[in-house]
């Protein structure tokens, strides 16, 4: 979903212009669903953000981003009141990271909204309905970092990786990686 919201349309457009003979079948889903599909060989390649413990030595890192706590610029949330958490659905590792962080720091919270999509999470946070944990690069202009989250220390980093089966020829894998990196100036390895 991270890629689909920002880089995917440009990637698909450029890829098809440069490689009209290559047919792509693209599915967009949250990390844990993609990993399940990959393990079941429903898909041969996954491009997804993962935290270090989930990264395999065979994964190819595209770029790294930090997770940050984000809120609407219009609203403030004190840690003395139950924190409204806007989160992704259970197939997203960011949800687990957010809940774990709040529970480790003994912060009272409730899930004010759950969405399977980045657009849903960002929209609800922008409306002032709560805070969320997302990649720094996905924060919108009407959002800002949640200052109270400094109490939690530095949030985790995520790495956007390519995971591909041996069914994907090395030449095609390299082609996809090269095309993705060309769209990410300053973020690529």
Summary of predicted features, one role per range:
Residues 1-54:
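Central regulatory/effector-binding core of bacterial HTH transcription factors
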Residues 84-105, 172:
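Secondary-structure junction motif
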Residues 29, 43, 47-49, 114-116, ...:
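Short beta-strand and adjacent tight-turn residues that come in two discontinuous sequence segments
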Residues 54-90:
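Flexible hinge/capping segments at coil-to-helix
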Residues 55-60, 65, 126-168:
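Beta-alpha-beta core module
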Residues 7, 151-189:
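A late-sequence structural motif
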Residues 38-39, 98, 123-128:
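Hydrophobic residues within well-ordered alpha-helices
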Residues 23-29, 108-117:
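Short beta-strand-to-loop elements that line the ligand-binding cleft
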């Amino acid at each position: 979903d991270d890629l689909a919201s920002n880089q995917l349309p440009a990637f698909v457009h450029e890829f098809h212009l440069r490689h009209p003979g290559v047919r792509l079948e693209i599915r967009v889903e949250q990390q844990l669903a993609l990993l399940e599909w990959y393990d079941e060989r429903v898909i041969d390649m996954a491009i997804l953000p993962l935290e270090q413990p989930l990264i395999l030595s065979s994964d190819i890192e595209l770029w790294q981003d930090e997770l940050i706590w984000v809120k609407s610029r219009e609203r403030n949330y004190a840690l003395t009141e139950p924190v409204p958490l806007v989160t992704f659905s259970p197939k997203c590792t960011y949800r687990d990271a957010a809940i774990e962080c709040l529970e480790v720091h003994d912060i009272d919270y409730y899930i004010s909204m759950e969405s399977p999509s980045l657009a849903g999470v960002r929209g609800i946070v922008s409306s002032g309905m709560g805070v969320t944990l997302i990649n720094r690069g996905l924060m919108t202009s009407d959002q800002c970092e949640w200052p109270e989250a400094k109490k939690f220390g530095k949030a985790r980093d995520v790495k956007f990786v390519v995971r591909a089966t041996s069914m994907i020829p090395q030449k095609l894998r390299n082609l996809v990686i090269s095309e993705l990196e060309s769209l990410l100036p300053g973020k690529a390895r």
